[in-house]
Amino acid sequence: MSGARTAHALVFLLGCSALALGVCSASLEHGEAEYYVAAVYEHRSVLSPNPLELSSRQQALELMKQNLDVYEQQVMAAAQKGAHIIVFPEDGIHGFNFTRTSIYPFLDLMPSPRLVSWNPCLEPFRFNDTEVLQRLSCMAIKGKMFLVANLGTKQPCLGSDPGCPQDGRYQFNTNVAFSDNGTLVGRYRKHNLYFEEAFDSPADVDLTTFDTPFAGKFGMFTCFDILFFDPAVRLLRDFEVKHIAYPTAWMNQLPLLAAIEIQKAFATAFGVTVLAANIHHPTLGMTGSGIHTPLKSFWYHNMDDPEGHLIIARVATNPQGLVGTENTTSEMDPSHRKFLKVLSGDPYCEKDAQEVRCDEAAKWNLNAPPTFHSEMMYDNFTLVPVWGKEGHLQVCSNSLCCHLLFERPALSKELYALGVFDGLHTVHGTYYVQACALVKCGGAGFETCGQEISEAEGLFDFHLWGNFSTLYVFPLFLTSGMTLDTPDQLGWESDHYFLRKRGLSSGLVTAALYGRLYERN
């Protein structure tokens, strides 16, 4: 592990900082901890029938009241279970598909909690156009819990402000946090907008935290933000946040960016707890919420049920996840020993009933599987098929080479492939990605590799690794029926990042290492 990489490992692989030189790997271990009760609600929002048409403030409040009434019901249901905090989704109160003009009646005036100490429920007349904030504040008091919600807000600006829009106001996609006594304790204005013409991105990134008596410091960001350095990574790096409140309105995109998949990957990679509340509109591909710790997830994904869903879970105040370790067991797992040998350049040897066949890692014989290209996540991946019951595969693109060392208890008729992408993603956002992905293909043809599927039967014991140019690598792990699994081990070995798993309980849909090179966006 290079000195530069070691110097930054504290940021991403919590616990690896103890290893100044040499091996930095991570195994998943539990530790004793205190707990709190968290709740997230996946909300089927009542939407405006005509979001492009201008309505009155009163009409807007009447629509939002329908959603807020559901919120209050869920707060009280969570209170009966002893919840300390509840998180609601992005766009859950006002909906979406507005223009900049048509959303205006839905916006509350938003003072900064850094400048103003305010309890909207107890001081309802202090500011005009704050009816939604008042209602949320009163819910927090009634439920005796911290509450995080998302709403649209407005802020007047002067013509002397060079960034002031022509209509004389800023409009923000805003998360708010209230304490259990109704005080406004946090405001976050979404930085990385996702085709949201109704809203502005703030000139300066909000790095928002709020303190709680039950779990210390929480951070907030929204939806698309999870893929970018600001605010998500900087918030963890600079403020030592261990818990994230994450409202989102996420449209699932398989095989690499389903909602619960990226939520869990973020929690595992950074060793934090993520309270993720998604909107529930299955016809739009929008579902997938969860309470994710580095080791365990309580999630909900349902494309059939039209109604919302409340998740409540008991989670550690100090999440335990990636713990830096050298091998301390008397006997190393045989598959991991084989991985280390292959990584060091030793020949990979495959045993059958008649002989032992060895191929040097750098030399591929004439029977090696063919390389092909297929579109995955709108990107041109280079792939090789995964054939046989065991093997070692390699596939490269630009500076990234991905490897798979695998064994299969039984063959299935399904086609799997190992894919690599190292380049700038340019569809539905622009950002640089390095990805190694083991995926089930949609059919028997190579051209189906990368298609969106959610059911699988194939079982693997495997190591997946690559020579990533970034520290920020997210382990994506999705199994049949939109279920989540956790790696047995993650970490760096000889400047390669790896994921190890044995004993899958259901068929593998996706196992991937999703690297982000933030500086090359």
Curated annotation (Swiss-Prot):
<protein>
    <recommendedName>
        <fullName>Biotinidase</fullName>
        <ecNumber>3.5.1.12</ecNumber>
    </recommendedName>
</protein>
<dbReference type="GO" id="GO:0005730">
    <property type="term" value="C:nucleolus"/>
</dbReference>
<keyword id="KW-0378">Hydrolase</keyword>
<feature type="active site" description="Proton donor">
    <location>
        <position position="190"/>
    </location>
</feature>
<dbReference type="InterPro" id="IPR043957">
    <property type="entry name" value="Vanin_C"/>
</dbReference>
<comment type="similarity">
    <text>Belongs to the carbon-nitrogen hydrolase superfamily. BTD/VNN family.</text>
</comment>
<dbReference type="InterPro" id="IPR012101">
    <property type="entry name" value="Biotinidase-like_euk"/>
</dbReference>
<feature type="signal peptide">
    <location>
        <begin position="1"/>
        <end position="25"/>
    </location>
</feature>
<keyword id="KW-0732">Signal</keyword>
<keyword id="KW-0964">Secreted</keyword>
<feature type="active site" description="Proton acceptor">
    <location>
        <position position="90"/>
    </location>
</feature>
<dbReference type="GO" id="GO:0045177">
    <property type="term" value="C:apical part of cell"/>
</dbReference>
<feature type="glycosylation site" description="N-linked (GlcNAc...) asparagine">
    <location>
        <position position="380"/>
    </location>
</feature>
<dbReference type="GO" id="GO:0047708">
    <property type="term" value="F:biotinidase activity"/>
</dbReference>
<dbReference type="Pfam" id="PF00795">
    <property type="entry name" value="CN_hydrolase"/>
</dbReference>
<comment type="function">
    <text>Catalytic release of biotin from biocytin, the product of biotin-dependent carboxylases degradation.</text>
</comment>
<dbReference type="InterPro" id="IPR040154">
    <property type="entry name" value="Biotinidase/VNN"/>
</dbReference>
<feature type="glycosylation site" description="N-linked (GlcNAc...) asparagine">
    <location>
        <position position="181"/>
    </location>
</feature>
<feature type="glycosylation site" description="N-linked (GlcNAc...) asparagine">
    <location>
        <position position="128"/>
    </location>
</feature>
<dbReference type="GO" id="GO:0005576">
    <property type="term" value="C:extracellular region"/>
</dbReference>
<keyword id="KW-0325">Glycoprotein</keyword>
<feature type="active site" description="Nucleophile">
    <location>
        <position position="223"/>
    </location>
</feature>
<feature type="domain" description="CN hydrolase">
    <location>
        <begin position="50"/>
        <end position="329"/>
    </location>
</feature>
<dbReference type="Pfam" id="PF19018">
    <property type="entry name" value="Vanin_C"/>
</dbReference>
<dbReference type="InterPro" id="IPR036526">
    <property type="entry name" value="C-N_Hydrolase_sf"/>
</dbReference>
<dbReference type="GO" id="GO:0006768">
    <property type="term" value="P:biotin metabolic process"/>
</dbReference>
<dbReference type="InterPro" id="IPR003010">
    <property type="entry name" value="C-N_Hydrolase"/>
</dbReference>
<dbReference type="GO" id="GO:0043204">
    <property type="term" value="C:perikaryon"/>
</dbReference>
